[in-house]
């Protein structure tokens, strides 16, 4: 049986690191307030000349190095992002060009906001299991600093920029064991960016609009449910999970999922304090951090899970 296994990971964070105290000088907030409610202490903000594709390409280079592959061996590129470089072409094709890949491999974007990496990873898994690809580059990359209203203290403290990437390769040994994706558009008003560009004009707000309590309540409920579903459908138990690698949006949401599964926070890769919410980039960023720190080891079982606007959510159970 053919599996899709992670052969390398990489990540990239912009140099500009912004603390809660830095933000407190611009909006009415404090380090204590932000930390108590979210667990966030820092976030990274892209430079004016840094685009989402730049962050993605840097993370991709590091993932390729870790996998021991040349960029020309990649035969599929999927970029999960809600902040593309431009309306079109896809950010994935721009990354393809920046990596010097000229073999004509498919390259496209997936937009499921904070669940985007789950959607992209599941799609790449299907390509590999069907024999349509051997080495897929799956990237989550965001520049959310460009869609945040920096005068809105309820949202500007939450988000950061960054990118994470994995190389997913065909393997005879288990990699991705099971995944599940869900969506419900009935909740779109809880979290969105309503602005549109039409006929050369911007209509609606170009900034993130969020009902914080509504998002929290829905996220806690659905992440617990999908974690249960993926583990049970794979024939596993929560006790067999070595690490949870969650979407890094809010420490309290992460703690809730771990508690529901009966797992301690010692089994959670936690980066929200250093990165903030980087949307589609958060899970691959956390995954790469866990691997490079030595926390995550080969052969261990990982549960990746996340939820984003739409709502869209998903979980992936894999053996690293």
Curated annotation (Swiss-Prot):
One of its GO terms (biological process) is fatty acid biosynthetic process. Pfam families: ACP_syn_III, ACP_syn_III_C. Its main location: cytoplasm. It catalyses: malonyl-[ACP] + acetyl-CoA + H(+) = 3-oxobutanoyl-[ACP] + CO2 + CoA. One of its GO terms (cellular component) is cytoplasm. It is found in: Cytoplasm. Residues 248-252 are annotated as: ACP-binding. InterPro entries: ACP_syn_III_C (IPR013747), ACP_syn_III_N (IPR013751), FabH (IPR004655), Thiolase-like (IPR016039). Catalyzes the condensation reaction of fatty acid synthesis by the addition to an acyl acceptor of two carbons from malonyl-ACP. Catalyzes the first condensation reaction which initiates fatty acid synthesis and may therefore play a role in governing the total rate of fatty acid production. Possesses both acetoacetyl-ACP synthase and acetyl transacylase activities. Its substrate specificity determines the biosynthesis of branched-chain and/or straight-chain of fatty acids. This is Beta-ketoacyl-[acyl-carrier-protein] synthase III. It comes from Neisseria meningitidis serogroup B (strain ATCC BAA-335 / MC58).
